[in-house]
Amino acid sequence: MLTHKIIGLDVGSKTVGVAVSDLMGWTAQGLDTLRINEEENELGITKLAEIIKKEDADTVVIGLPKNMNNSIGFRGEASLKYKEELLKILPDINVVMWDERLSTMAAERSLLEADVSRSKRKKVIDKMAAVFILQGYLDSLQ
């Protein structure tokens, strides 16, 4: 059993999918999708900090997209920048960077298998990818 919940993030250029663990550390549930604007440096960190406090989380797992050759590309750099910005607001939070290769594709596949419409998929894909990222991390703790 965890002493605090864990938050999972799928950071994109326009949205951040947010997931939260249960206190047992067994399951991840989709929580929210934050609208952001990387170009304007509007990253939704203040709203995320509110969620972290409300959920009483002490750890944030951020998906780190890597290339298949294990190098970190543009999106990976953006996730690392997001981590830095989060730590400016919440310096005491534990941040784990988690290899998220193929998490969005897996989320998309499971939504397709569930016959979710295209418009609905667009609304939930980032939150679902955050669930896949966080669930992978939780499974590694078992």
Curated annotation (Swiss-Prot):
Top-level EC class as recorded in UniProt: hydrolase
Major location category of this protein: cytoplasm
Record-level Gene Ontology MF annotations: nuclease activity
Gene3D superfamilies with a match to the protein in the record: YqgF/RNase H-like domain (3.30.420.140)
Keyword Nucleotide-binding: no
GO cellular component: cytosol
Listed InterPro entries: RNaseH-like_sf, YqgF, YqgF/RNaseH-like_dom, YqgF/RNaseH-like_dom_sf
Keyword Nucleus in annotation: no
Alphabetized UniProt keyword annotations: Cytoplasm, Hydrolase, Nuclease, Ribosome biogenesis
Enzyme Commission designation: 3.1.-.-
GO biological process: rRNA 5'-end processing
Subcellular location: Cytoplasm
The family this protein is said to belong to: Belongs to the YqgF nuclease family.
Protein purpose: Could be a nuclease involved in processing of the 5'-end of pre-16S rRNA.
Name of the molecule in the record: Putative pre-16S rRNA nuclease
